[in-house]
Each structure stands twice: as structure tokens, then as C-alpha cells.
Amino acid sequence: MKYDFTTRVNRKGQGSFKWEDMYAKKPNVADGIVPLSVADMEFKNAPEIIEGLKNYLDQVVLGYTMANKEYKKAVCNWMKKRHNFEIQEDWIINTAGVVPAFFSAIQEFTKEGDGVIIMTPVYYPFFNAINLQGRKLIDCPLIEKDGMYYIDYDLFDKLSQVSENKVLLFCSPHNPVGRV
């Protein structure tokens, strides 16, 4: 597949959160600046993706769907094949997305006032998921050395010994530093 990865697409006015947020905060931002705040495309869709979606849409009726047995089996197979980790189908809980998933996890496994450990810098919705639910944000900053980030295992061990700290909200691959 040959594709143009050099042409920038300005998504201003298209409802893109990161673009609209950038212009709201800095209305006079210079041309050529690209907001890299979220994992969102900066290039036109590849022709193969457009064609694949058109073919799919020709065959289906859009509506609400649910995860069926085949879906859950595929997830289990993926985890085994890609990560050598066996999971059970009943462990799989579907959510409306990753952000609602970790909001729900914090609500399920902690109570107000409990500590939730994060490793900063980290995906910005982690902060809201903790603070908006009345939990205490416990920072275990990553160590930056020669342009790479590393977990501070000594600090993490210390923080995990505190009985009020109930959950580690872990991002892997880590956003924004990219480490797995």
C-alpha cells in the first residue's frame, strides 16, 4: 500500500476535540502546528479503509449491536496468541470506550477518599477519572533519563504499601511516552 504521510489535514471546524480545544486555548496558533494531545488521525483515511467500509456498509444495516460469543472468543484467542495470556469469556466486560472503562473501574474498586496511583506524565483523562469521583490522586512520576522514561519501582513499592492506596491505574503502552 502506497500512502501519502506528508500532507497535513487541518481538522478545524470538523468537531475534532483536540483541534477545537487547541484553537479555543490558542486562537491565533500558527499554521502548521498539529495538536498531539490524543491518539487521533492527522492524515486522510487510506483508500483501502474507505473501500472496506463502503463494502461493509453495502452488506449491513446500522444499529445497536452487542458482543456475541464469536466476539468474546476472538478476544480470548487474541490475548492468547499475542500475549500468551489466557482469559475467560466471562471476564470480558464491554464498555462505551476506554475512558468510561477506567471511570467504572475506579468506581468499582475504590471508594471516595481512596488513593489511586498513576505514573505521570500520563493520558490526561486519568486525572479527571480520579478527581471527579472524589478519589485521591497519588503520583508516582516516571523517571526520565536520556530521553527514555522508566518506572520508579522504589517509589511505587513505597506508595503501594499505603493501605489507603487501592488501585494502580496503569497505561500500557504508556501514553504519552510510548513504553510498553
Residue ranges and their predicted role:
Residues 2-97:
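N-terminal small-domain helix-loop-helix segment of the aminotransferase-like
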Residues 36, 53, 75, 92, ...:
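Generic structural signal for small/hydrophobic residues in well-ordered secondary structure
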Residues 44, 102, 126-127, 177-178:
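Glycine/Thr-rich phosphate-binding loops of Rossmann-like dinucleotide-binding domains
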Residues 84-85, 106-110:
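Glycine-rich helix-loop-beta junction characteristic of Rossmann-like nucleotide cofactor-binding loops
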Residues 108-130:
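Conserved PLP-anchoring active-site segment centered on the Schiff-base-forming lysine
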Residues 120, 139-144:
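Short beta->alpha connector loops at strand-helix junctions that form conserved
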Residues 132-137:
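A short helix-loop-beta submotif of the ANL/AMP-binding
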Residues 142-180:
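Active-site phosphate-binding strand-loop segment of PLP-dependent enzymes
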